Amino acid sequence: MNDLFAPFPGAIVMVWMPESEHACAPGPKFRPVLLLAENRRPDGTLEVLVAYGTSQQTSRNAPGEFTVRCQDAAFLAKDTRFCLNKRMWLPVTQEYFQRDGKTQVLGSLPAKSLRGAARAAQEVGLA
């Protein structure tokens, strides 16, 4: 299988995020996620650990969450809250990562968001 993109931790990409962590199929909404890690399965499939992103309720963050402001990341249309406590492994496939035949790698986590990301990671035991 050809990889759709070269994932790297800290990348913000668009995916068809499943609605539950137990779902085995892409979800109905194409949304931003933060890539946390990558892994190659024994069968050769590339998978990435992603954290859920939403533009809802960005003015308050629960433990394990941080917000990236669109003024700090021009590639985001709206402020986006990333929830590190809502993460899952997804295969890097067209079904999850493409819309209209294109993969959308938006950009990298901006420097101004690193402190918030580190705090959120610590709160959920990732650091």
Predicted regions mapped to residue ranges:
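C-terminal terminal-subdomain/extension
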Residues: 70-127
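Generic detector of intrinsically disordered, low-complexity, polar/charged segments
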Residues: 7, 24, 41, 61, ...
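Compact nucleic-acid interaction/catalytic patches
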Residues: 22-30, 35-72
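Loop/turn positions that initiate beta-strands
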Residues: 9-12
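Short, surface-exposed secondary-structure edge patches
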Residues: 2-6
